[in-house]
Amino acid sequence: SEKCIRDRHTLENDITVINDAYNASPTSMRAAIDTLGTLTGRRILILGDVLELGENSKEMHIGVGNYLEEKHIDVLYTFGNEAKYIYDSGQQHVEKAQHFNSKDDMIEVLTSDLKAHDRVLVKGSRGMKLEEVVNALIS
């Protein structure tokens, strides 16, 4: 989507960070997964909660995790109470997965693990403030 292109940062060593941290729905998360899956390099997906889903929240987050099947995502990092459900259902579909209770912990693991040619996509509801993760990577 145009949003992805507009918020695409290229770092040294051909590392790409796509910031899509301003809004999220289960549908737009699936679209983001599709986008990331088309890129070459190691694909790292960072997802936070989709807020305001009401009583369907758990089931919808589980659905996003299930959607990762055969989407060629290498690494899944999640943050947030609801995103834990994405981790639970999605971890079997990726090479490596980890759920974080703190953004600082996630940033630490991510920055220490980042390699040349990695493709990182960050997405979550605005209230999750996942742009903090993006800013840590691109600063």
Where are these regions (language model features)?
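Short, small-residue-biased leader/transition segments that mark boundaries at the very start
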Residues: 1-5
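ATP-dependent carboxylate-amine ligase
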Residues: 8-139
